[in-house]
């Protein structure tokens, strides 16, 4: 039994030892597997991160590659498949589009600036027009009162003759307020005395008129009157000599035109009330505007000449020369003004040229000026046409054909009237597609000498026509 007990105890100890060893081994295996799973999980996280970075880098490189090629999204997919020549053509087209857009932007900015300046001019003109109307209304509402005068040449003679003494404030117009504040009895008394004074004064005026008529008859028959008539006739001869000399100097050289201008200025005080003198002075101002090189001088001469032409027109509306030179000076002044005033001057120019042609249809100058106006109007730009339509009820309208007819009429009335006119005829025919006629008139223009500054300025146009027409 003891031996069996010892054997059983030893077996139990061995089983316990084996169980402990197995448990430890199981724990080791379990820990080892868990550690391996942890390591494997860490690698799996690091590997996708590296792959994602590589893929992102690749995508970035692809995007960079696509973005390096200009164009839209579709172009990015197509351009890599194009040849080098095709890609260059596409890029050239894109450059052209960008250049066109930049030019369009500059034009829009310039148009905005022009419209802003035009708006300012319109506002200024409207404001000045309103102020002028207000001044006229104030003048009509508050007319100027007559002032008292003690001189014998004024209406105070009437009161002196009736009363025989100087008037008090209550008896004169200046004392109307004081007299008006008196009683009814006093006003009635004044009315009766005033009626008596009126009767006396009327008789005085009638006697004075009779005496003056008698004096006029005696003066007309006196030797002094005959001397005055002789002086008037000699004065008329003098002014005719001045006008004739001014006409001759106007047809001469530049120095002659300057002398003619000075001649008229020196005689303005003596003959400035005559219409035929004033329009010649306006013509001389036009000559000086052409001869002057400075911009301010040109504008000043044109402005002064326009004022003289206006003064001449106020003395009569039936002078073709007055209308003609007023139109010329309007055109010269318009060259130094803004777009709004230029268009307004264009309407005034056309109006007075038409009037000059109506009064003197055989004068080639009017037809030449009308042709030049039609030619310039037919070449107005878009902004000028829109401005004319916005500011005026009837916009400016003319064609190259209208201009050609007027130039041909001037040439018909006086062949070789103007070298510039023949150049205009050649240009009109060329624009109408009649090159043979244009070539003919170009050669005719080359035969004429330069008479005016406009003729000299058209020399460049003649050279261009010769190159184009051959």
UniProtKB/Swiss-Prot annotation:
Membrane-topology annotation of the record: Single-pass membrane protein
Modified residues (Phosphothreonine): 160
Residue ranges annotated as motif FFAT: 157-163
GO molecular function: microtubule binding
PTM notes: Phosphorylation at Thr-160 of the FFAT motif activates interaction with MOSPD2, VAPA and VAPB.
Cited InterPro entries: RMD1-3_a_helical_rpt, TPR-like_helical_dom_sf
One term under GO cellular component: postsynapse
Biological process (GO), any one: apoptotic process
Coiled-coil portions: 91-125
Intracellular or extracellular location(s): Mitochondrion outer membrane; Cytoplasm; Nucleus; Cytoplasm, Cytoskeleton, Spindle
Its biological purpose: Involved in cellular calcium homeostasis regulation. May participate in differentiation and apoptosis of keratinocytes. Overexpression induces apoptosis.
Family indicated by similarity: Belongs to the RMDN family.
Protein name: Regulator of microtubule dynamics protein 3
Organism for this UniProt entry: Mus musculus
Encoding gene per record: Rmdn3
């Amino acid at each position: 039994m003891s031996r069996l007990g010892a054997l059983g105890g030893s077996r139990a100890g061995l089983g316990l030892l084996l169980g402990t060893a197995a448990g430890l081994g199981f724990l080791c295996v379990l820990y080892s597997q868990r550690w391996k799973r942890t390591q494997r999980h860490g690698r799996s996280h690091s590997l996708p991160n590296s792959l994602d970075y590589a893929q992102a880098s690749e995508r970035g490189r692809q995007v960079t590659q696509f973005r390096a090629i200009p164009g839209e999204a579709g172009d990015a997919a197509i351009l890599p498949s194009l040849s080098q020549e095709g890609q260059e053509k596409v890029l050239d087209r894109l450059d052209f589009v960008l250049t066109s857009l930049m030019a369009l932007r500059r034009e829009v900015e310039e148009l905005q600036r022009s419209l802003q300046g035009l708006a300012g001019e319109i506002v200024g003109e409207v404001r000045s027009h309103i102020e002028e109307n207000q001044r006229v209304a104030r003048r009509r509402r508050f007319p100027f009162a007559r002032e008292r005068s003690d001189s014998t040449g004024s209406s105070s003679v009437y009161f002196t003759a009736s009363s025989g003494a100087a008037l008090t404030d209550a008896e004169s117009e200046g004392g109307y307020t004081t007299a008006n504040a008196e009683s009814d009895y006093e006003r009635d008394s004044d009315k009766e005395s005033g009626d008596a004074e009126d009767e006396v004064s009327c008789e005085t005026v009638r006697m004075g008129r009779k005496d003056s008529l008698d004096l006029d008859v005696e003066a007309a028959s006196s030797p002094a009157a005959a001397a005055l008539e002789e002086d008037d006739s000699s004065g008329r001869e003098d002014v005719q000599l001045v006008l004739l000399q001014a006409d001759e100097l106007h047809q001469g050289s530049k120095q002659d035109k300057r002398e003619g201008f000075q001649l008229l200025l020196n005689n303005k005080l003596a003959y400035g009330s005559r219409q035929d003198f004033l329009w010649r002075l306006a013509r001389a101002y036009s000559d000086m505007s052409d001869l002057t090189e400075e911009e301010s001088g040109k504008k000043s001469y044109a402005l002064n000449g326009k004022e003289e032409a206006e003064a001449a027109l106020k003395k009569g509306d039936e002078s073709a020369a007055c209308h003609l030179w007023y139109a010329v000076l309007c055109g010269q002044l318009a060259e130094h003004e803004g777009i709004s005033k230029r268009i307004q001057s264009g309407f005034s120019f056309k109006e007075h040229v038409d009037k000059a042609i109506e009064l003197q249809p055989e004068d080639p100058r009017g037809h030449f000026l009308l042709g030049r106006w039609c030619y310039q109007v037919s070449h107005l730009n878009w902004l000028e046409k829109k401005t004319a339509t916005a500011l005026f009820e009837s916009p400016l309208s003319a064609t190259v054909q209208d201009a050609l007819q007027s130039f041909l009429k001037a040439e018909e009335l006086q062949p070789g009237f103007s070298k510039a006119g023949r150049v205009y005829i050649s240009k009109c025919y060329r624009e109408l597609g009649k090159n043979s006629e244009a070539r003919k008139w170009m050669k005719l223009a080359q035969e004429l000498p330069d008479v005016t500054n406009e003729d000299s300025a058209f020399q460049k146009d003649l050279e261009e026509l010769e190159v184009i027409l051959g």
